[in-house]
Amino acid sequence: MFTLKKSMLLLFFLGTISLSLCEEERNADEDDGEKEVKRGIFALIKTAAKFVGKNLLKQAGKAGLEHLACKANNQC
């Protein structure tokens, strides 16, 4: 009877340790995934800002050139 209790206690102890190791590994994997998502969102925002900025500068440049041409030809 005593050896059965020792065996059960040993199995419980080993199961608890393996469960805690699995949980730690799962938590580590989840943390890495969040960092990748954050990087992905930041890259998306950065790319969108570059695109919008480039288009705004093009439009401003065209408007500025048209205004200068208008002033130069006195057609305003």
From Swiss-Prot:
GO terms for cellular component: extracellular region. Keywords: Amphibian defense peptide, Antibiotic, Antimicrobial, Cleavage on pair of basic residues, Disulfide bond, Fungicide, Immunity, Innate immunity, Secreted, Signal. Pfam families: FSAP_sig_propep (PF03032). One of its GO terms (biological process) is defense response to fungus. Expressed by the skin glands. It is found in: Secreted. It comes from the Eukaryota. Disulfide bonds join 70-76. Residues 23-39 form a propeptide. Residues 1-22 form the signal peptide. Its main location: secreted. Antimicrobial peptide with activity against Gram-positive and Gram-negative bacteria and against fungi. Has been tested against S.aureus (MIC=2.5 ug/mL), B.pumilus (MIC=2.5 ug/mL), B.cereus (MIC=7.5 ug/mL), E.coli (MIC=12.5 ug/mL), B.dysenteriae (MIC=7.5 ug/mL), A.cacoaceticus (MIC=25.0 ug/mL), P.aeruginosa (MIC=50.0 ug/mL) and C.albicans (MIC=2.5 ug/mL). Also shows a weak hemolytic activity. Belongs to the frog skin active peptide (FSAP) family. Esculentin subfamily. This is Esculentin-2-ALa.
